């Protein structure tokens, strides 16, 4: 039974249904928790949906169960590189190369780790001040007379690392803050604003306050403080792919969702901190949108957004289902046509559909 589930998971992976693959591998692991290959394969599926931390955990478990499983080291190295943990990635890849010396991927990835590590070390080197030109009329100062030259400090790294991934209907932001009390975390949602403040005793408060790539529905957004992270789920106002978490000039901005005035009232939470003028922030966002001229993909995104906002329930269901199942290549408004069957991926004219290499 476990092998059958693993085969189905592999088929889902090849069909780019990575979330389904993770779920099926998890069920296979429940039935056979000592199979290293299941953990290594689930790690690969987790990498595809940007669950890099979970992928490292799976790879470590696979290595523990079967120390000679080369693909487990490859998965760990890949996930650690995505997390920018290049030294850890290199160590895993070197171990994998010793297990499978004929696998060229290890050498290529080790070389990339060396390059990244060298870049990090270069950033830490303090630049020397330029020498002053000599002058025949101005006497040179002695070492005792010369004022000390301040050495610029390396830029401080953020207190906590964060990452972002998305689904058609929501974007998920994960802040890797361990053992932070829930009462020390403040999260607020605006129409296109996210504000996160984490107070840590004895440290400067951590702030994450991006203007988001697209608009959200604040009433449907939520967050959870866990032992190892703060997970924030942003409900997208429209079914569309965000190019990044933060808005950038020239990127598409979605129109305000069509919700009732009752739902658009934002909840107010008691706080000792100064209140934020969300209306002012949103007015600035709207002014920037008004001044922008949309073209190309941005204009197309707005066109589809307008269709969605004015569509009836069946049309919206058809758009959501066709977009999600076709990996964004098909958008149908005919529920009778797509409601009873899976919508296959259809590449644009002149392009070829390719599967992820497993």
Swiss-Prot record:
TPR repeats lie at residues 2-35, 37-69, 70-103. One of its GO terms (molecular function) is protein-folding chaperone binding. GO terms for cellular component: cytoplasm; cytosol; nucleus; SCF ubiquitin ligase complex. Residues 255-275 are annotated as: Disordered. Residues 268-358 form the SGS domain. Keywords: Cytoplasm, Immunity, Innate immunity, Nucleus, Plant defense, Repeat, TPR repeat, Ubl conjugation pathway. SUPFAM superfamilies: HSP20-like chaperones, TPR-like. Disruption phenotype: Delay in flowering time. Plants loose R gene resistance mediated by RPP2, RPP4, RPP5 and RPP7, and show reduced response to auxin, jasmonate and coronatine, and enhanced tolerance to heat shock. GO terms for biological process: auxin-activated signaling pathway; defense response to fungus; embryo development ending in seed dormancy; innate immune response; jasmonic acid mediated signaling pathway; negative regulation of seed germination; protein catabolic process; regulation of defense response to fungus. Induction: By infection with the oomycete H.parasitica (downy mildew). Interacts with RAR1 and HSP90-2. Interacts (via SGS domain) with HSC70-1 and HSC70-3. PANTHER family: PROTEIN SGT1 HOMOLOG. This is Protein SGT1 homolog B. The lineage of its organism: Eukaryota, Viridiplantae, Streptophyta, Embryophyta, Tracheophyta.
């Amino acid at each position: 039974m476990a092998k059958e589930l693993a085969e189905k998971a592999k088929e889902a992976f090849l069909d780019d249904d990575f979330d389904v693959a993770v779920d099926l591998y998890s069920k296979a692991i429940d039935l056979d928790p000592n199979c290293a290959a299941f953990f290594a394969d689930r790690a690969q599926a987790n990498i595809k949906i940007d669950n890099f931390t979970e992928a490292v955990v799976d790879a470590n478990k696979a290595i523990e169960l079967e120390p000679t499983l080369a693909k487990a080291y490859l998965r760990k190295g890949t996930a650690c590189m995505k997390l920018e943990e290049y030294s850890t990635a290199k160590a895993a890849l070197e171990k994998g190369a010793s297990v499978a010396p004929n696998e060229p991927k290890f050498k290529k990835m080790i070389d990339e780790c060396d390059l990244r590590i060298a870049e990090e070390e270069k950033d830490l080197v303090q630049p020397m001040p330029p020498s002053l030109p000599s002058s025949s009329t101005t006497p040179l100062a002695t070492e005792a007379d010369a004022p000390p030259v301040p050495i610029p400090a390396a830029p401080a790294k953020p207190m906590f690392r964060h990452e972002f991934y998305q689904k058609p209907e929501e974007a998920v932001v994960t802040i890797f803050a361990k053992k932070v009390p829930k009462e020390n975390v403040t999260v607020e949602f605006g129409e296109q604003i996210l504000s996160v403040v984490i107070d840590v005793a004895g440290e400067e408060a951590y702030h994450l306050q991006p203007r988001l790539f697209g608009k959200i529905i604040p009433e449907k957004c939520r967050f959870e403080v866990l032992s190892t992270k703060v997970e924030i789920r942003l409900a997208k106002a429209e079914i569309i792919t965000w190019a990044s978490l933060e808005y950038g000039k020239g990127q598409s901005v979605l129109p305000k969702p069509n919700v009732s005035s009752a739902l658009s009232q934002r909840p107010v939470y008691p706080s000792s901190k100064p209140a934020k003028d969300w209306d002012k922030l949103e007015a600035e966002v709207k002014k920037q949108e008004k001044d922008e001229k949309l073209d190309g993909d941005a204009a197309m995104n707005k066109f589809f957004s307008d269709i969605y906002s004015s569509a009836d329930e069946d049309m919206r269901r058809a758009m959501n289902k066709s977009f999600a199942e076709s990996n964004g290549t098909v958008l149908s408004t005919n529920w009778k046509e797509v409601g009873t069957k899976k919508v296959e991926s259809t590449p644009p004219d002149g392009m070829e559909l390719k599967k992820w290499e497993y």
